From Swiss-Prot:
It comes from Geotalea uraniireducens (strain Rf4) (Geobacter uraniireducens). Monomer. GO terms for biological process: cysteinyl-tRNA aminoacylation. Its EC number is 6.1.1.16. This is Cysteine--tRNA ligase. One of its GO terms (molecular function) is cysteine-tRNA ligase activity. HAMAP family: Cys_tRNA_synth.
Length: 494
């Protein structure tokens, strides 16, 4: 099966055929850098990071551009509130964004252009639109004339007349059509500005993405991405500006991620119902957050709640525990390396594991080829882990075959890990990290737990089972579960 992607432009899943064989040009709208990023922003960026990684894993050469919107009303407002220059705000939040993305394990895009570093390209594009009759000057502003661009609203499939009728916003009478949007904004006194043929001003939001995407990727490119909320007006306006200027199709595939919701409402700054990436990473491991964000298909809504993150943590822990068990099996009886597994000699459970592990790369590819279905891909990993647990718990001895099977599972999960950017940690240390995090929320210290475990071992040795049970129950009351084995006693948080 070849890769198929859901294209918002056609409303269908289509075969993905790059314009130039072997190469993919992809632009994703970045953040407006006026505040800390929330989990909705994390989702948009993680989703396209995985799409980027998957395309690369298919052997495609991907030119991935993600911008920073570093001039905007929201940035100016915050700068005024804090009494600093606009670029003190944008620079601060670019640094914060970069730090958040690095924590979430994102690969760097090929280019990360900033709007303010592309003013000449923006002015040239606006001038071209005026020269071609698609834009007009209105005082110190320049507007795009939507009626001149016939396919306007082809992405969101809205109707201009209906929208006009429905528009209750106060409309500037000087506009030729109420839906005309601004390409260049005249600077108000005290606002940052750049010189232009229309006076001192700054670019509108939509034009920057047309100018930067076409500069880095050409007039027509393969993929344009962003959150669903950008379909209208942002992407619709990008299409209008770019296609009106170039006379060519702008983008072949439009991909949009679904929202992170809280109580069925979009997480957003304006609603105030948001959690920043930093806040969440204070509490949860970054791999847990990434795991959570990829646990749903990228177009589906994703409900954010403490409970859902805790469930993601438990799910990830289950997989890592299996990876630790695999490592322990390999340590106790290393696979001699490269040995063939004789399938006919396997018992029923081993046979199932052998089959599921062997077919994992193919099933992963099928899931991802179906519009990047990371949820299904993760389901395949859980399925495999169930088989691993069964085989390891039923195995009477650590045989060479068992080690060879474990080595195969480890290698095949490893291949997927690189594309999803999860399961990449050293398993034992990840489990320790999770345990430490949970322990930090307990009302008992790790030292105290370990002291009690030592005391309990001594009590058991002295056959003082009353004291030993007392300690176990006391710890259980603190949500600590003890597990006795031949190697000693280990503990985990319930
Ligand atoms: N709740 C969300 N779920 C998924 N993606 C989101 C969410 N909120 C924003 N995004 C996406 O993040 C990217 C950056 O958005 P942008 O900087 O324009 O956000 P914003 O409009 O400032 O955020 P907010 O919506 O909170 O005001 C866009 O692709 C946007 O669609
Ligand atoms: Zn954009």
């Amino acid at each position: 099966m070849a890769l198929r992607v859901y294209n918002t432009l056609t409303g269908t899943k289509e075969d993905f055929v790059p314009i130039e064989p072997g190469k993919v040009k992809m632009y994703v709208c970045g953040v407006t850098v006026y505040d800390h990023c929330h989990i909705g922003h994390a989702r948009a960026n993680v989703v396209f990071d995985v799409i980027y990684r998957y395309l690369r894993s298919l052997g495609l050469e991907v030119n991935y551009v993600r911008n920073y919107t570093d001039i905007d009303d929201k940035i100016i407002n915050r700068a005024n509130r804090e009494g600093v220059a606009y670029d003190a705000i944008s620079e601060r939040f670019i640094k914060e964004f970069d730090r958040d993305m690095a924590q979430l394990g994102l690969l760097l895009p090929t280019s990360q252009p900033k709007a303010t570093e592309h003013i000449p390209e923006i002015i040239t594009l606006v001038q071209t639109l005026i020269d071609k009759g698609f834009a007009y000057q209105m005082g110190g502003d320049v507007n795009f004339c939507v009626e001149k661009f016939d396919p306007y609203l082809k992405l969101s499939k809205r109707n201009l007349e209906d929208m006009q009728a429905g528009a209750r916003i106060e409309v500037d009478e000087r506009k030729r059509h109420p839906m005309d949007f601004v390409l260049w904004k005249e600077a108000k006194p005290g606002e940052p500005f750049w010189e232009s043929p229309w006076g001192k001003g700054r670019p509108g939001w939509h034009i920057e993405c047309s100018a930067m995407s076409m500069k880095y990727l050409g007039e027509t490119f393969d993929i344009h991405g962003g959150g669903k909320d950008l379909v209208f007006p942002h992407h619709e306006n990008e299409i209008a500006q770019s296609e009106a200027a170039s006379g060519k199709p702008f983008v072949k595939y439009w991909l949009h991620n679904g929202f992170v919701n809280i109580n069925s409402e979009k997480m957003s700054k304006s609603l105030g119902n948001f959690f920043t990436i930093k806040e969440v990473l204070d509490k949860y491991d970054s791999e847990v957050l990434r795991f959570f964000l990829l646990s749903a298909h990228y177009r589906s809504p994703l409900d954010f709640s403490d409970q859902n993150l805790t469930e993601a943590e438990t799910g990830m822990e289950r997989i890592y525990k299996a990876l630790v068990a695999i490592d322990e099996t390999l340590a106790s009886n290393p696979a001699t390396g490269g040995e063939e597994i004789d399938a006919s000699s396997l018992g029923e459970a081993e046979r199932e594991l052998f089959d599921k592990s062997g077919s994992l790369p193919l099933r992963f590819r099928e899931a991802m080829d179906d519009d990047f279905n990371t949820a299904l891909a993760m389901g395949h990993i859980f399925d495999l882990v169930r088989c691993v647990n069964r085989v390891l718990s039923e195995a009477k001895e650590r045989s060479n075959t068992l080690s060879a099977l474990c080595a195969q599972v480890k290698a095949n999960i490893g291949k997927i890990a690189d594309v999803l950017g999860i399961f990449t940690s050293e398993p034992a240390s990840l489990l320790t990290r999770l345990k430490d995090r949970k322990a930090s929320e307990l009302d008992i210290s790790v030292e105290e737990i370990e002291r009690l475990i030592t005391e309990r071992a001594a009590a058991r040795k002295a056959k003082d089972f009353k004291r030993s049970d007392e300690i176990r129950d006391f710890l259980l009351g603190k949500n600590i579960v003890l597990l006795d084995s031949a190697q000693g006693t280990s503990w985990s948080v319930k």
